[in-house]
Amino acid sequence: MCIRDRLNPLWKACVFLIIAVTIISLPRKPIDVAIPNITVELPSWINGNKAIHVSLLSQEKAYFTQYGGAAAKAIYGDRGLLVVKTSAPLRHLHSPEECLRGLGFNVQYKGVSHATLPTAIYKATAPDGATYRVAVSFASSKGHSTSNVSEAVWNWMQQGGIWYALQRISPWNLEDTENNNWDNAIMAAMDISSSSPFIQPAKF
């Protein structure tokens, strides 16, 4: 056996060792981290009600600090609005079931409404028995809107862009017309069009 034949396995072993060391040494940073320094500013008024801003929980603040993106919450009268803004929807966008159940709510999926934006509807029952309508839509800076997280992620993988989760909370017993009026008021305040739901970045 010639020297070259003897060295070949050794060279291969060295190459694999170098590759392994390189992989181990790479920074442990997730690839789906959103663009940093994203901010969300909710409208000061919606439908005649002034915003009462609600602070994010400490774990929510830590999450957005680590993985980018941003969120803001406010109460308008007897209704609430949560907006999440991200360039990495795979990381940040999800149905409200996960968070609400973690807070002790019983959550039931009730279907999809297209009266305004494509919207997934949930019924959330608080530990004290109070019931709420939780409506969630996802819209992008590219003009897409959907009620489905998977569709939002698929569109993001095709075209990128900034994605927003719009979560509206209202008492469960309101009429559909009242809920639709609330949605339309939010859309007007945030420059969202139902035919081309583009959220103007200047508003955030």
Regions found by a protein language model. Give the residues of each.
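Short, small-residue-biased leader/transition segments that mark boundaries at the very start
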Residues: 1-3
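Extracellular/secretory pathway and lumenal proteins
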Residues: 5-6, 103
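Internal/C-terminal transmembrane anchor helices
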Residues: 6-29
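A short, solvent-exposed beta-edge/loop patch
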Residues: 19-21, 111-204
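Hydrophobic alpha-helical transmembrane segments in integral membrane proteins
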Residues: 21-43
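Low-complexity, compositionally biased segments
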Residues: 35, 40, 95-101, 176-179, ...
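Generic detector of short, well-ordered, non-transmembrane alpha-helical segments enriched
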Residues: 42-45, 163
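Short, solvent-exposed recognition patches
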Residues: 44-158
